[in-house]
Swiss-Prot record:
The lineage of its organism: Eukaryota, Viridiplantae, Streptophyta, Embryophyta, Tracheophyta. This is Transcription factor bHLH19. The gene is BHLH19. One of its GO terms (biological process) is regulation of DNA-templated transcription. Expressed in roots and leaves. Residues 115-164 form the bHLH domain. It comes from Arabidopsis thaliana (Mouse-ear cress).
Amino acid sequence: MDEDFFLPDFSLVDIDFDFNIYEENNLSPDESLSNSRRADQSSKFDHQMHFECLREKPKAAVKPMMKINNKQQLISFDFSSNVISSPAAEEIIMDKLVGRGTKRKTCSHGTRSPVLAKEHVLAERKRREKLSEKFIALSALLPGLKKADKVTILDDAISRMKQLQEQLRTLKEEKEATRQMESMILVKKSKVFFDEEPNLSCSPSVHIEFDQALPEIEAKISQNDILIRILCEKSKGCMINILNTIENFQLRIENSIVLPFGDSTLDITVLAQMDKDFSMSILKDLVRNLRLAMV
């Protein structure tokens, strides 16, 4: 009987033999060191490839910002599950994007600093207070104001201004008409009596007798000047009475001239300045008083 008859059947596949261990045990020291270096490099390469894969992992796409109906909305072009779509996350992303961008201009709406906003409020408050004071002052100048609102005040002020302009135009026309009247003569001439007495022995003679109807007064007006000419009988204190009477009518005497005319008559000329309130009725009163002063 054969000795191998009782041995079990097996193949080379059933032999589990670690050739690497065998080779490492049978390699020389130099070859073992070289193999260990290659193993370390292979391990480092595996780690590096793993890190590069992590770096090349797709990131969440940055959502571009678009302006629709004056509101900022985020539109995503990436449909991966890594993108956060909650409103809070969108606000955080927007804040970060704005912070990374350029500095905002100070003139844009909603970016005014608190100090500038406070100064603007104070300036606007002062402007409104000043405007209210002006309206109050204007309402005080308007007679018969029924309401104190701004619209009524402006309407009444416009009407009042038109009325005053019309009055001014009328006064200018009246003043121009008065200036065109170069002179006004108020004269009361002396009465002259002719008494003819026939005389048979000689030729007829003419007897002229002057009544006591003097003085003769003439007044002329030119713009603001008044020229008064008086022809009167010579009497004591006559000139003083005339000048005092003229000054009593608020006339400023600029010049006066007295010339004798004959033995008993004076020719008096007075130049005076009159006020704007001087009227024709006052001039008549002046002539009347001058006549009474020389009686």
